[in-house]
Structure formats: structure tokens, C-alpha cells
Amino acid sequence: MDLEAKLHEIRKPIMVLGTSSGAGKSLTVTAICRILKNLGEEPIPFKGQNMSNNAWIDWEGGEMAYSQALQAFACGINPSAEMNPILLKPQGNSTSEVIHLGKSIGTTTAQNYYKDWFIPGWEVIKKSLKSIYELNPNCRLIIEGAGSPVEMNLIHRDLTNLRVAKYLNANCLLVTDIERGGVFAQIIGTLELMKPEERKLIKGIIINRFRGDLSLFEDGKKWIENKTQIPVIGIIPWLNDSFPPEDSLDLIEKKSLSKNHEIKVGIIKLPSISNFSDFDPLENEETILIEWIRKSKNLSTYDFIILPGSKQTIKDQKFLENSGLSQDIRDYSNNEGNIIGICGGLQMLGTTLEDPYFKEGAKNYSEQKINGIGLLPLKTTFFKKKLTRQINTKSIWPCQSQINGFEIHNGQTILDDSQSSLKINPIFEDLDLGWFKENNKGGTIAGTYIHGIFENDSWREQYINLIRKSKNLPILNKKSISYKKKRESIIDNLANEFHKHLNLTSFLS
């Protein structure tokens, strides 16, 4: 298929650009995907290049940004790495892991990325677009841009914004966040920095996160339309629903919505945290309050502690040790505390971490082997190749239930025979996916490689009941609200709000 020759035959793509990072591009795309699905169309999300450590694994083991996976759920389809052909995963020190079509193909510095990776990156994007249209000839792509489309020092190497828009001749929407202030300057400045042929692609402007009476912006709307000759097709009100943030900048502002909590959870905010969407199911539990822990403190006020995934496990373990948090966690464990580690968190709960190939943050030979927190008799060695796959297994503890999720990690974890006094048991029928042990004084220490473990409703409910029992709280006998149903409800509510305030009619011809 010659995509360039067939562009006149395909349904016109819709592309969402933003005046800045955090303007609301991801949520706007998610909402439009669900709106079009409900209208009987075949929307497919696409983002040529994303930078995020919040990842998803598709059914073929391909790695992609979690935000595009969510957008696929909004479309009612399975996520595929072709929806996000380039994923950059920051590793610190201005370096990133480069993933093309779901597979890790190397690392690069910010300085060298556009010099070495621009041409192959653009070819990968075109290859993905061609494949999507070959498999789905009646689809309509809903494309997300990145940051601002007019970063003048980078625009000649743009892989995500106007290059894609021009290639597909997409109908573009420009979204801006009025909550941050300065929307008039942002809109006019963005449009003024575009070339005439680029500006012609902008077919509508969206004002996002407006607080108060929408009619109060009517004069502002008229001014923008008169100045730009582009219609303001939507003024989206401030939405209070929880929704997974795309990157760690948003994570800092994310707070639990639970008010009448019975269980207080502390999650360690690692410098290189990854896959923080693992905890969205807990955010949606009415009885749970989540707090993010950023520095050394007495942890005794928490009912359980979570050590999340990490993109740089050695580096983050050194942070825990140097900050005093490692000792805080050990003290918490000795005081009947409940702890669970996920992926890198599991590895850090072990006795040793070895990084012979400098894959997980070791800076020199003295850091190639370091001690873990030492609560589980496990040792981890990091190798050159990482494991990415979907998981379907059964749990043994804290209940017997079907478990779905995914693995995405470097390193192999085995029992540390030198710590035979620390007895542990498997959590799953697949014995290498997780372990737990009960403290002599009460409390449990557990760790698993499965991302998405808390999305499994029965498992989550029984783990929470384990904590409730330790607090002498009544066991919750009713079934937990299905997280996947809750996620669908959030997407529906998001789409309904956008549909009320967004005029897409002219884009659906």
C-alpha cells in the first residue's frame, strides 16, 4: 500500500496539538476516541513518539506508552505498539532507552538523539501508519501531539507534531489549558510561529480546564475567533474525575480522592519511578487513602507500604539507602508493617542487586553489586536484554484467583541460599513471579514482577482484607468494584463531558 497515494481515500485523521505540555492533549484524544466509538466509527489512537516511563505491554510483548493503551481502551480495541511506534524511556543523566515498534533497540543521549535517530524514527512512524491503514482501511486515526508543536530549536527534527500532521493532511485541533493562565498569548504565539501551510491545518481551538460559568468566556471566545479566524469549538470545564497522569510531573500533583478512608497507604516516590499507573485501582477504592513518600520519615502511620517499579533500580536503591528510607522500611517491617514491592520494588526488597552491564544505574565498578533492603532472601542480576510479556497465571496467596498483568523488567531474581533463615513462599503458580513471607511479629513482606496486579479485583480485595484483618477492621464481604468497569465509567464520563462542550460535527465528514 502506497499510503501517500491513498490519503485522499482514508477518513480524515484528527490530530490534537497543544500550546504546551500538560495542556490536556491525552485526555482530549481519549475523550474523542470514546465519542467516535459511540457514534459507530472505528477510531484508532496514534502518537508517533512518546517519552514516558509509564508503559504497557501489548499481546505480542511490545512495549508502548500507557497513555496510548488507555486511548485504545477508549476505542474499544486492544492496544498495539504500532499506536506508539517510538517510545523514549528516560534513564536520568540526559539519556533515554529507545524503543521502536515495541522493541528496545538501544540508548541515546539527548544531544545525539535527533542526530542519530531522526531518520530511522521517521521511517518507523511511516511504517506504523501504513500497517494501521492496511489492517483497518475504514478507521479514523486520532493523533496526539507532544509538548508544543513550535519548539523552534527542535522543529526541524520533529517526529510527533507538524511533520505527522502535514504527512497525513490531518484536521488539527489546538488545545490550551486556561487553568495555567495566559491562553491568549499561548494561542496567538503558537499560531504565529507556524508556517502558513501548517497554520492552515488548524481547524479548531479548545479551551481546557475552565473553572466557573462558561458564559463568562464568551467575549474571550469571540476575540480569539476574530483574531485567528479559527473557531473555538469547545470550552471544556474543570473535570474532577481521577484519571491516570501521563508522566511524573503530573504525579507530583496527584492526590487520592478518598475522604472517609479506613486504610492509609504509603507509596515511595522513587526518583526513577515507572508504571505508577499500577496504583490507580487503589486510588479508586473508597476506603483507601494514598500518600506519596518522598523523604525519610516514621512510617508507622501507614497500614501498608508500596515500593513501586523503577527504571534505574541500582540508582533508586542507592537513593533509598542514602536518604534513610531503606532503614525506615526495615524499621517499619520490624514493627509489624505490611510491605509490597512491584518489579523494581521487589528487586530492592531483596538482599543483593548486581549490574554487571551497567543497565540499571550503576555508575562505576564499585556500584555493580550493592545491598538491597534485605527483607526478602532474593538476589537479582541484571542482564543486557529485558523481559516484556503478558501474564496469565493463578495466585496462591492471599487467595486463589486468576491473575492477568504484564512483565517489563531487566534482571533475573533467584533465591539467596545464604539467607536460608528467611523463609519465603510463592505468590503464584508460576513460581518466579512473586514471593511473600510473614513476619514473626505480624505483617507480611511481598514482592511481585506483575504490573497491573491490583487490577485483578479478587486479588486486590483479598489483599486489602488481609490489611483490614491486621487492623481488626471488619472484612469486606461484598465484591470489589471491578477496576476495569470503573475505568470504563471514567472514560464514559470524560467523553460525555467533552461531548457536551465540543463541536466535532465539521470534522466527521
Curated annotation (Swiss-Prot):
SUPFAM superfamilies in UniProt: Class I glutamine amidotransferase-like, P-loop containing nucleoside triphosphate hydrolases
Gene Ontology terms: biological process: cobalamin biosynthetic process
Keywords assigned by UniProt, alphabetized: Cobalamin biosynthesis, Glutamine amidotransferase
Claim: tRNA processing is one of the keywords in the record: no
CDD domains assigned to the protein according to its UniProt record, in alphabetical order: CobQ_N, GATase1_CobQ
Pfam family, one: GATase_3
Active-site residues, as the UniProt record annotates them: 343 (nucleophile), 451
Residue ranges of domain GATase cobBQ-type in the record: 262-459
Molecular function per GO: ABC-type vitamin B12 transporter activity; catalytic activity
Top-level taxonomic group: Bacteria
Annotated pathway: Cofactor biosynthesis; adenosylcobalamin biosynthesis
Function in brief: Catalyzes amidations at positions B, D, E, and G on adenosylcobyrinic A,C-diamide. NH(2) groups are provided by glutamine, and one molecule of ATP is hydrogenolyzed for each amidation.
Family the UniProt entry places it in: Belongs to the CobB/CobQ family. CobQ subfamily.
PANTHER family on file: COBYRIC ACID SYNTHASE (PTHR21343:SF1), DETHIOBIOTIN SYNTHETASE (PTHR21343)
Protein name: Cobyric acid synthase
Organism whose genome encodes this protein: Prochlorococcus marinus (strain MIT 9215)
